Amino acid sequence: MKTSNSNNKAFALKMKGAAALIIAAILALVFTGCPNNAGGSGSATPPAPSENSYEFVDIQGATITGVAPNYALPGTDDSWKGVFIAGRTVKLSPYKIGKMEVTYELWYSVLKWNTDNSKGYVFANRGREGSHGTDGAAPTAAGKKEPVTMISWRDCIVWCNAYTEKEKGIGECIYRKSKTDTTVLKDAKAKEGEVFICDKAYADMNKKGYRLPTEAEWEYAARWQGSNTENAVQYGDVCLTKLNSASGAKDKWDTAETGEVAWYNGNSESKTHPVGEKRANALGLHDMSGNVWEWCFDWYDTIAAENVTDPQGAASGPGRVYRGGSWYYFAYNCTVGGRDNVSPDDWGSDLGFRLAWCP
């Protein structure tokens, strides 16, 4: 874990119900990362999307040339330096990424479709409406636009396939048992021996289905600023937000800018908030920092100085990557360079995801 409060983080990811909210409130009062950068309660709320819709933003293909930061980071170890490190060149193909985090409303609609149509998708966790809802219950008017939480990486893999089948047909499902066994993964609990089948998921990027972003895709979308050099550094042909700042912020993490773009423990009132209330980043993406941590596809690994194309992470690792910070944690956890990981069967009231897919 990259923070000095690593035990608190591990605890938070397993917290349930009122206990999580009480402890989060105490931490927010006692350990607020930067007391003067809370920002407003949120920028103007964007127009409400149509029922259950999920908007995507187009990301053009790019080649990113890694750069070593010449400015201070929240910590000294490599987990603060992101994936575009000095000596590494990353080529990304075009992709689409969700404008918002996946809401509980959308999550639940797919679960209901699965049940109503006997599609056979099996989840280890039913999901929760934000940080304080009832697991698996019907969405409420007040909380349906909050991010889904309490879902594991394995749940996300299976749900992505279910959503793909619902919207595009089962043939476009991304996550398969292996490159040679193209069985669609439908069961977050299934094992072969002692190994969960989902943990060996093969991502068929030739399909058009919904999926988790790779870590490189996530970070590029969080940091992209085009030719705008404000609070950014040139990485080859593109400017990327500095590693010590939140996504969309115009200054580093310990300034008021963090509170303008992110919900964290200094302004969240110890809970999640409806997606899209904070100012978007340069690509029009909301909540890339704060509100909930977001799962990525990759196994966590040390980043090597090499040339790679569309990297998907290591073949195995200590845990699956999650990025971005959350309502429960500190302003410095919202920085776009921070990397962390946890077991793929973990879940928490501050852990969710957003979607990606290849056009």
What name fits each language-model region?
Residues 88, 238, 248, 271, ...:
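Surface-exposed recognition segments
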Residues 197-205, 253-289, 340-343:
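Short, well-ordered junction/capping motifs at the entry into regular secondary structure
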Residues 1-13:
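N-terminal secretory signal peptides that target proteins for export/translocation
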Residues 60-63, 96, 101, 152-155, ...:
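Short, flexible loop/turn elements at secondary-structure junctions
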Residues 2, 21-114, 153-193, 223-229, ...:
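Short, compositionally biased
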Residues 91-258, 301:
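Active-site microenvironments of metalloenzymes and redox enzymes
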Residues 115-123, 257, 261-263, 310-311, ...:
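Proline-centered structural pivot motif
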Residues 57-58, 96-101, 147-150, 211-213, ...:
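Structural recognition of the beta-strand scaffold that forms the well-ordered cores
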